[in-house]
Amino acid sequence: MDRYAFLSFYKCTHQVGKFVGSDTWSNVLRESWFFNNWKELLVPVSLSTFLLLGLKGYLDEQFCQVEDLQDEASPNFVEEVVTLFFKDSGRLMSNIEQALEKYPRDFNRWDTYMQQLKGSCSSIGASRMKNECMSFRDSCGQGNVEGCMRSFQKVKREHAVLRQKLESYFQLLRQAGPAGAATRPVM
């Protein structure tokens, strides 16, 4: 039991919302219903799933698919993949930065580098970063230097935020030990 965090389910707010009304009885019903049914509204989830909720919007379903590849034979698989992503993405961002300085208005070159970075983002499910890469590529297609520069700054910012969030995520999983392994419950 200690390996599970408990998370209130959407059903709670949905059911309680059914009883909202203007008179006192609706308040009594709402409170009574919740008091008598709260145990049914809790869903056990693994620690990793619970922690991933903090990364919602930064990661998409692809990250969960990467997690599904992790097993007892390779217990650090996801962390290793993410480490490789940050190493590779750092190199690609350095290449983009150099290209922006060395080759002003070479939109094809910029776009090629950003396409590689976007592919890396897609492979681990880094959705916010991928979206900023797409914005950069759109600006390249429009020949918009300022748009490219703005988008690249956003890419760098999203990269830094994602790195910090994932480092915290893996640190918490390591502290929890094997019990916090990235497994999702069968529903």
UniProtKB/Swiss-Prot annotation:
Keywords tagged on the record: Cytokinin signaling pathway, Two-component regulatory system
GO cellular component terms listed in the entry, alphabetical order: cytoplasm; nucleus
Domain named HPt: residues: 74-169
InterPro entries to which the protein is assigned, alphabetical: AHP1-5/YPD1 (IPR045871), HPT_dom_sf (IPR036641), Sig_transdc_His_kin_Hpt_dom (IPR008207)
Molecular functions per Gene Ontology: histidine phosphotransfer kinase activity; protein histidine kinase binding
Coiled coil feature spans: none
Name of the protein: Pseudo histidine-containing phosphotransfer protein 1
Species, as recorded: Oryza sativa subsp. japonica (Rice)
